[in-house]
């Protein structure tokens, strides 16, 4: 049994007809888990370090690309669960396919020197900065 926190309006004089819809949407959408990659991005003078959480996704199912200043991380996890009774008769079969993808704008990077590693459900991508590329552009006003 799950315990849920009940949100109630403590001020009885500020009740509006829309409170019902607010409560309904809160109950409806709170049970959905967000399907995105939790990420930390660190920047130093020399590089960017991206740490992305991809728990349960095998290394073989993770793709990392860098194109036009955009780092893209995507992954896919498939779970097949089969339960049989003692006689071997199938009583339940479940499948799940989860896909995640995020993109990050990280310009001024040496594309040939990008490195990635994956351990304990955390993907670490190191993107060395290119000091030869000009970051700021001056635009003249007419």
Curated annotation (Swiss-Prot):
InterPro entries: A-crystallin/Hsp20_dom (IPR002068), HSP20-like_chaperone (IPR008978), Small_HSP (IPR031107). Pfam families: HSP20 (PF00011). Induction: Overexpressed in acid environments. SUPFAM superfamilies: HSP20-like chaperones (SSF49764). It comes from the Bacteria. Gene3D superfamilies: 2.60.40.790. Residues 27-142 form the sHSP domain. Belongs to the small heat shock protein (HSP20) family. PANTHER family: HEAT-SHOCK PROTEIN 20 FAMILY MEMBER (PTHR11527). This is Acid shock protein. It comes from Streptococcus thermophilus. The lineage of its organism: Bacteria, Bacillati, Bacillota, Bacilli, Lactobacillales.
